[in-house]
């Protein structure tokens, strides 16, 4: 019986972790890991923080070069797949080469959503999604630079804190009337907004950019309020575009991402997907959900690897992620849209836990500088419990 070949398209967090999991689970066939970037798989969370702050900070690779050799993982960086042919169990590379697979895993992730109004300004306009992006930003963010950050999500706020720590003057422009609106409860939004403002970050909330101009070396944004903001650099983070076109062209079910089931299987039985590129149905509501987090990429990679081998997948825990801003570690687990939130501890001292409940059932929690407590909270949220009145 010939060896099976498993191909993984996308050499990021999910792709590399899936390859590692396959070997951990004793898969003895061929593994081919194909990545478009000219870098071995690396950790992305540090790109908006330590990597920018410390010029000596090296990229943090997921595994050493020896790891891929020792585990016989055929890592092919700087290569792309241009077509999937499900009926032939074959992928076509951009250079015209073809590779046959028994199982295929798609982990292409996402790219930064473009903002043409800003892109047309030319130089000194940045996004942050990749190591190459971070290397460019590292050269640009300097002391006394006026930095305009468009987008008040997690990455925008981390960049605001990092830029301030480097001595820059920072302004954040956000279209919504709050920050981190998609992933933080109101108590946490207000707390973080106050911390940033105390450090000198200026905010324009509930505000749109209606015009963007370049005047000499200055970048000028006109807001819908009529106000004008001027900067030397613009960094924008307004969401992501998910790399699902390859899957859609192959006839897989997509909906602004590749639709997968609880086993990370797509509409094609021998094709699986994991990470940011995916949409998965929530067990309780049936709604399609995407979780763009480091933890979710690892979790789905593990589930997909087990499913590809025909093994029972591990039980998923409650969704968890974290952010570090101003030296404050904030970890979130479970449902951040809970109906009610309760505070234990003192937010003013930057040490507290927020509990989110629905009908007196604990459904979410936020730990602020309480990493040890978060370990217990993650276990609790794996099995929601009634909170005593």
Kindly label every feature range from the protein language model.
Residues 68-85, 197-209:
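A conserved beta-strand/loop element that lines the FAD pocket in flavoprotein oxidoreductases
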Residues 2-5, 11, 24, 277-373:
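Mid-to-C-terminal Rossmann-like scaffold of FAD/NAD(P)H-dependent oxidoreductases
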Residues 9, 99-109, 150, 229-239, ...:
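Short hydrophobic core segments
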Residues 108-166:
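Glycine-rich dinucleotide-binding loop and its adjacent helix/turn
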Residues 85-99, 213-228:
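Conserved beta-strand-loop-beta-strand element in the redox core of flavoprotein oxidoreductases
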Residues 2-74, 162-183:
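Beta1-alpha1 glycine-rich phosphate/pyrophosphate-binding loop at the start
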Residues 121-144, 220-222, 227-303:
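FAD-site-proximal beta/loop scaffold in flavoenzymes
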Residues 155-211, 293, 316-325:
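Rossmann-like dinucleotide-binding cores of NAD(P)H-dependent redox enzymes
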């Amino acid at each position: 019986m010939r060896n099976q070949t498993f191909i993984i398209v996308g050499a990021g967090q999910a792709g590399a972790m899936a390859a590692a999991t396959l070997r951990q689970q004793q898969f003895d066939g061929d593994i081919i890991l194909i990545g478009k970037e000219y870098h071995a798989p690396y950790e992305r969370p540090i790109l908006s923080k330590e990597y920018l702050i410390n010029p000596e900070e090296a990229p943090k690779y997921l595994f050493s070069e020896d790891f891929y050799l020792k585990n016989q993982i055929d890592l092919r960086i700087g290569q792309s797949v241009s077509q999937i042919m499900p009926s032939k169990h074959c992928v076509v590379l951009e250079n015209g080469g073809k590779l046959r697979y028994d199982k295929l895993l798609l982990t292409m992730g996402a790219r930064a959503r473009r903002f043409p109004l800003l892109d047309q300004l030319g130089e000194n306009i940045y996004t942050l999604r990749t190591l190459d992006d971070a290397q460019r930003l590292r050269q640009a963010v300097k002391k006394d630079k006026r930095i305009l950050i468009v987008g008040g999500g997690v990455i925008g706020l981390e960049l605001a804190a990092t830029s301030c720590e480097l001595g820059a003057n920072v302004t954040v422009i956000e279209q919504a009337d709050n920050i981190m609106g998609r992933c933080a409860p109101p108590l946490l939004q207000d707390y973080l907004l106050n911390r940033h403002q105390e450090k000198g970050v200026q905010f324009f909330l509930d505000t749109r950019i209606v015009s963007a101009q370049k005047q000499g070396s200055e970048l000028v944004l006109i807001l819908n309020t009529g106000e004008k903001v001027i900067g030397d650099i613009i960094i924008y983070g307004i969401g992501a575009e998910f790399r699902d076109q390859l899957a859609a062209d192959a006839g897989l079910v997509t909906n602004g991402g590749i639709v997968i089931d609880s086993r990370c299987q797509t509409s094609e039985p021998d094709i699986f997907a994991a990470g940011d590129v995916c949409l998965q149905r929530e067990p309780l509501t049936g709604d399609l959900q995407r979780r763009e987090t480091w933890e979710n990429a690892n979790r789905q990679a593990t589930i997909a690897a087990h499913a590809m081998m025909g093994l029972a997948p591990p039980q998923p825990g409650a969704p968890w992620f974290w952010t570090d801003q101003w030296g404050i570690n904030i970890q979130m687990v479970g449902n951040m849209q809970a109906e009610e939130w309760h505070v234990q501890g003192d937010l003013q001292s930057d040490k507290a836990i927020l509990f989110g409940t629905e009908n007196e059932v604990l459904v979410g929690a936020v730990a602020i500088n309480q990493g040890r407590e978060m370990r217990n909270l993650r276990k609790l949220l794996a099995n929601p419990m009634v909170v005593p009145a």
